[in-house]
């Protein structure tokens, strides 16, 4: 009986040892696999980090080559979104009673009475009557006077049939307008009437009836020939 008990104990102990070895081997395998996975993960992380560094350096180089100013958005730390209620589409605001605004009447300002401007009256100067030259009758030449002038026959005939024309009476100075005090005083200048000019005798009518007279200095000069015989 003791031997059986010892054999059972030894078998149990061996079985336990085998189980322990199995568990230890499994643990070692799991640890080794975990280590391998950890190393693999670390390698992947290192590769990713290297790739990111390369991309960052390339991006920096491109930014240095192409530099464009970009507008920076202003960010305020103290600002917060304003909450507002979301109203339904069929929502209508409440009706408010109509308020009557008082009608403002414009104030009528009293217009100050302006003083009437007193205009000084202008003193009228008396009219200066212009003296009128009395009409002098034109003296008509008689036949005896014409004969004494020793004029040619055609000229005498034209003078005999010529009717003497009276000279129209005109005032010496036209009426002057009223002069104000602000204007300068102008003294009237007396004007003499110009007599009516008589018709001049043409030279061509006189030349045929003149005879040349010898002159030692100037030469020959025509002398009028008498038409009427002179009574001695």
UniProtKB/Swiss-Prot annotation:
Modified residues (Phosphoserine): 30, 32-34
GO cellular component: extracellular space
Location, primary (coarse class): secreted
Pfam families: Casein
Keywords: Milk protein, Phosphoprotein, Secreted, Signal
Signal sequence annotation: 1-15
Organ and tissue specificity: Mammary gland specific. Secreted in milk.
InterPro entries, alphabetized: Casein, Casein_beta
Compartments where located: Secreted
Domain of life: Eukaryota
Role according to the record: Important role in determination of the surface properties of the casein micelles.
Family in the record: Belongs to the beta-casein family.
Protein's recorded name: Beta-casein
Organism: Camelus dromedarius (Dromedary)
């Amino acid at each position: 009986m003791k031997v059986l008990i010892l054999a059972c104990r030894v078998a149990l102990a061996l079985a336990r040892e085998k189980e322990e070895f199995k568990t230890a081997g499994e643990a070692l395998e799991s640890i080794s696999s975990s280590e391998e996975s950890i190393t693999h993960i670390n390698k992947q992380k290192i590769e990713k980090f290297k790739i990111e560094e390369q991309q960052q350096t390339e991006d920096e180089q491109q930014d240095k080559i192409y530099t464009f100013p970009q507008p920076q958005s202003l960010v305020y730390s103290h600002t917060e979104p304003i909450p507002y209620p979301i109203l339904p589409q069929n929502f209508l605001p409440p009706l408010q009673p109509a308020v009557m605004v008082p009608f403002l009447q414009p104030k009528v300002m009293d217009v100050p009475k302006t003083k009437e401007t007193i205009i000084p009256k202008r003193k009228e100067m008396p009219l200066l009557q212009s003296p009128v030259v009395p009409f002098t009758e034109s003296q008509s030449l008689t036949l005896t006077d014409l004969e004494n002038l020793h004029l040619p026959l055609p000229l005498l005939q034209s003078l005999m049939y010529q009717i003497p024309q009276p000279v129209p009476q005109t005032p010496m100075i036209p009426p002057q307008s009223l002069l104000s005090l602000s204007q300068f005083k102008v003294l009237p200048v007396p004007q003499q009437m110009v007599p009516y000019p008589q018709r001049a005798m043409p030279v061509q009518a006189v030349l045929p009836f003149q005879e040349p007279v010898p002159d030692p200095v100037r030469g020959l000069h025509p002398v009028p020939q008498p038409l009427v015989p002179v009574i001695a």
